[in-house]
Each structure stands twice: as structure tokens, then as C-alpha cells.
């Protein structure tokens, strides 16, 4: 799944080479924002790869429920670097956030879906008309839903949007307070293995872009080369999902608080 990060190096070079003030030395600190589903980041954190590579830098890790909350923290200076889906940066920049794109991942069309109950009468996206759909506002799932509706000949006004964080959306979906749930992994894999759900639509035909790595502009301008090295370290962490798959699944299951079969399915997506 995360072969994607092997391509971040080039993206990082292209993005960071334009930052004329990039420094070769490691800075005093780096505050990293990550999500539960950030496999490469979670592995890098668990194995302390950054701490070992840059012993003079103090690293702090802050977990966020979704991209919008992470980028808000990045904008106000609470963190220096983060990774998020395709749409949150657009919302953040529209609100005036001074962020820099420093890396990109290819799209993962099977890792984000619209779910309905297994016995739901909703059989196709067009059937969502008039129904309640839960999702995190401003997230990549928001984008997935918009693109799916457009493909089906519907508009956003044709559904009843219910803006919820992943955890709250899962509860609402399980309690049948909403009719569908647009969500990403590992929440998707967890729901799938729990049973009682059906994938209405994934991103295969929707031409979505991948996730992005973003940094606060002041930090990136001073530490461009260092950020490139950090992304390279994340790529090394990602490689562990291939070279040490069983160990990585066990570690991710422990740190994410999810069963190993959920993690295995997540990586397959």
C-alpha cells in the first residue's frame, strides 16, 4: 500500500528546492502532526527513526482526528509539519493559511469509500438523494463524496450532509442515525471487518489526487533540506511494511489500538 512514499523524495526535492533559505543542518526541534492512519509516520515514531537519524533535534508528535484540525494547528503555529488528504489544504489556503506543499503521495482510490448498511435499500450513489450522509467537513472524504455525487448526476444539495468527526460518524452510522458514511482507512477497514456494511463507492473512477505533506512556511524556508531528509526517513519507515510486514502489522495494531486483521486489510487497500 505505502509504496507511495518511495516517490515522495522527488516531490520533496521539487518543492523544497525552491526554498532558497533551506539549511543543511538539523534544527533544534520539529513538531509533527499525524493521524491514526499515517502508517509511515506511526512506524517512524514507534521505531524512533527520526530521533536516531537526527539526535540533536527534539521531535514531538501530535495526533489529530482528521486533516482540517491538523492544518488549523499548522496555521496557528502549534506544529511544523503534517500530512493530510487532498482537500484540507485547499480549505486552509482559502482561509488564508500560509502553508507550503513539501511532498505528495499518489492517490489511494481503494482506501476511501462511501459505506452503507449491508441491508440498505441504497444500491447506487444516485440512491443517496434525500438521505443523510456523514463525513468530516473539509476532508478528503468530503471530496470523495462530491466527486461521487457529480459522477452520479447529483449535486451536494441533493443529500443531507451530516458533518461529524470519524469517531462520531462511526457511532452515528452504527446507530442508524445516518444512511451512509464517507470515510478513509483505517476506519473503513475496521467497519468492513466488523461486518454489516457494504461499500457503495470507492475512489477508483473518481480521479482523486493523493495526500500531501505540508509545512509552515517560516519553518520550511529555514529547514528545507532537513524536511527533505525527514520525508526520506518516512519512506524508509514505509518500506518496513514490505520487508517486515508481520512485525509492522503487529506494531501498528498495538499503536493504533486496532486488531491485526484490520491493519492487514488497511495495508492491502
Give the role of each language-model region.
Residues 1-29:
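Short, low-complexity disordered leader/linker segments with a strong preference
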Residues 24-155, 160-163, 179-183, 200, ...:
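Short, glycine-/small- and polar/acidic-enriched structural segments
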Residues 30, 130-135, 178, 216-220, ...:
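Second-shell loop/turn segments in exported
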Residues 44, 135, 139-140, 167, ...:
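Soluble non-cytosolic domains of exported or imported proteins
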Residues 114-115, 212-215, 219-220:
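Short glycine- and hydrophobic/aromatic-rich loop-to-beta-strand nucleating segment
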Residues 154, 171-176, 180-181, 190-195, ...:
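A residue-level marker of the well-folded mature domains of exported/periplasmic proteins
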Residues 222-269:
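Secondary-structure end/capping motifs
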Amino acid at each position: 500500500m505505502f509504496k507511495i512514499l518511495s516517490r515522495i523524495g522527488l516531490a520533496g526535492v521539487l518543492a523544497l528546492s525552491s526554498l532558497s533559505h533551506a539549511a543543511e543542518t538539523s534544527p533544534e526541534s520539529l513538531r509533527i502532526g499525524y493521524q491514526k492512519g499515517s502508517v509511515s509516520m506511526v512506524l517512524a515514531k514507534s521505531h524512533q527513526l527520526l530521533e536516531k537519524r537526527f539526535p540533536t533535534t527534539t521531535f514531538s508528535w501530535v495526533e489529530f482526528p482528521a486533516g482540517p484540525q491538523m492544518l488549523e494547528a499548522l496555521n496557528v503555529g502549534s506544529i511544523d509539519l503534517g500530512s493530510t488528504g487532498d482537500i484540507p489544504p485547499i480549505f486552509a489556503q482559502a482561509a488564508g493559511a500560509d502553508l507550503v506543499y513539501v511532498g505528495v503521495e499518489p492517490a489511494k482510490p481503494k482506501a476511501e469509500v462511501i459505506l452503507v448498511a449491508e441491508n440498505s435499500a441504497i444500491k447506487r450513489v444516485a440512491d443517496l438523494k434525500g438521505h443523510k450522509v456523514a463525513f468530516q467537513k473539509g476532508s478528503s472524504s468530503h471530496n470523495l463524496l462530491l466527486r461521487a455525487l457529480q459522477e452520479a448526476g447529483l449535486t451536494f444539495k441533493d443529500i443531507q450532509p451530516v458533518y461529524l468527526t470519524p469517531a462520531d460518524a462511526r457511532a452515528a452510522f452504527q446507530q442508524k442515525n445516518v444512511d451512509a458514511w464517507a470515510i478513509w482507512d483505517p476506519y473503513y477497514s475496521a467497519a468492513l471487518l466488523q461486518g454489516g456494511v457494504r461499500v457503495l463507492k470507492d475512489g477508483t473512477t473518481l480521479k482523486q489526487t493523493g495526500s500531501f505533506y505540508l509545512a509552515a512556511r517560516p519553518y520550511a524556508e529555514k529547514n528545507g533540506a532537513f524536511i527533505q531528509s525527514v520525508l526520506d526517513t518516512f519512506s524508509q519507515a514505509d518500506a518496513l511494511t514490505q520487508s517486515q510486514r508481520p512485525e509492522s502489522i503487529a506494531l501498528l495494531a498495538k499503536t493504533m489500538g486496532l486488531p491485526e486483521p484490520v491493519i492487514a486489510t488497511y495495508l492491502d487497500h
